[in-house]
């Protein structure tokens, strides 16, 4: 009974799905994948639907300032004087700016290197705004990395142009020439002017915590052994993750330690992960606290939010071990969080490119967050990318075949992830059989591209049944044609998603039952 409750987010039922009040639509009302768009609604009777009409574009084009008067009309008045607010905060126009560099004033608790929310909304290639999968900025640094990654994958040598800085220097202002008393490091790696951790504590009038530290602050905490490890959280791609806390601090955080690789492509990948984490500030994205480099051990450490509920991968495997099954309403809340996270990333012109169960984290209260942007990529002028990186098993067909792809490739990965959690097994091959032991990655990728997509099926022997809308949602995610596959924000309008958003699910109780937490938040002793 305990296992059945855990599988249904706190609902007691013999069938984890039967308690849902989700009416199954008639078979004739379920759309088919042969329709032009994989989703949604039929045309409204009587409405004007003669096809898409080209919108009229009204442009306000200012006339030339050199145009001559017509018919004796008076000449054009002189143009107004343009007064610019300079980036340094002065209201003086550029030609009136007094000589010398104005002083930079930083507020307490804010990094001089730009750790504010306003700076987090910008990338290396320009400012961002909500986009529909399209961009107008020049090719980004992520696209440059794509070429390097693709070349190295096929053994094509590439060298960095002379004078190009090493991406590892972007960890922070390590080499500094500041003369304002700030912290810096000389060319030999010796610290100059770094305040100690106790001085930071005095300045804050309290013990410094993770929100108070900038790049130099994290380096001080590391050098003075102020980072206390509380336990391991597992191994990620390229590094170990531990649960930590600062000495005297209250916030528990996850610290991902990555061993630096001399390969410049790997360094660029690590620095891209840091860059993306700095940009992102969303309730559906794992929060980033900071990073620092340890030259003595050749490692880069990344401090991020600790999500106590664990990864979706560990959760569904624990439910499977308990003999239960994750309910449809719980999967609905997880799908909603993932799609909202992807929609936010798209507004920042970011493709995650590594959606899988282990990169979807749950907080103690059930909030769903995306993490690990180690292979995320920002896309260029057409909103597309063409690199072959990421977790291959969850890749969309267009990525496997080396074609360009968009944010909809993450929708495919979301469908594979949900199908795996619902069925308690990786969904390929579709018939549920295991591939031959000697079958490798190429065989599996070939199968994904050429064979029919897997479908979510009922399991009468286990008394498991799924709604028709959920089955169709999975089909929409696993649409092989990337032109017909819906975007994350469109999938949020899917009938199943609309229905699931109206359901109330006690995700806190669900996680407590999965992990055996008691009312005090502690793990129950094993029986």
From Swiss-Prot:
Q: Which residues form the Protein kinase domain?
A: 227-497
The record's keywords, sorted A to Z, are: ATP-binding, Kinase, Nucleotide-binding, Transferase, Virulence
Binding positions for ATP per the UniProt entry: 233-241, 256
Residue ranges of region Disordered?
A: 1-143, 156-189
Q: Which SUPFAM superfamilies does the entry link to?
A: Protein kinase-like (PK-like) (SSF56112)
EC class, as a word, reads transferase
Q: Which Enzyme Commission number(s) are on file for it?
A: 2.7.11.24
Q: Where is the composition biased (Low complexity)?
A: 107-129
What InterPro entries does the annotation carry?
Answer: Kinase-like_dom_sf, MAP_kinase_kinase, Prot_kinase_dom, Protein_kinase_ATP_BS, Ser/Thr_kinase_AS
Q: Ranges of Polar residues compositional bias?
A: 134-143
Catalytic reaction(s) noted: L-seryl-[protein] + ATP = O-phospho-L-seryl-[protein] + ADP + H(+); L-threonyl-[protein] + ATP = O-phospho-L-threonyl-[protein] + ADP + H(+)
User: Residue spans with biased composition (Basic and acidic residues)?
Assistant: 177-189
Task: Show the Pfam families listed in the entry.
Answer: Pkinase (PF00069)
Q: What does this protein do?
A: Mitogen-activated protein kinase kinase; part of the MCK1-MKK2-MPS1 MAP kinase (MAPK) signal transduction cascade that is essential for appressorium formation, penetration and invasive growth. Beside its role in pathogenesis, the MPS1 cascade is active in conidiation and cellular stress responses. Targets downstream of the the MPS1-MAPK pathway include transcription factors MIG1 and SWI6, as well as GSK1 and MPG1.
Assembly state and interactors? Interacts with the adapter protein MST50.
What is this protein's record name?
A: Mitogen-activated protein kinase kinae MKK2
This chain's source organism reads Pyricularia oryzae (strain 70-15 / ATCC MYA-4617 / FGSC 8958) (Rice blast fungus)
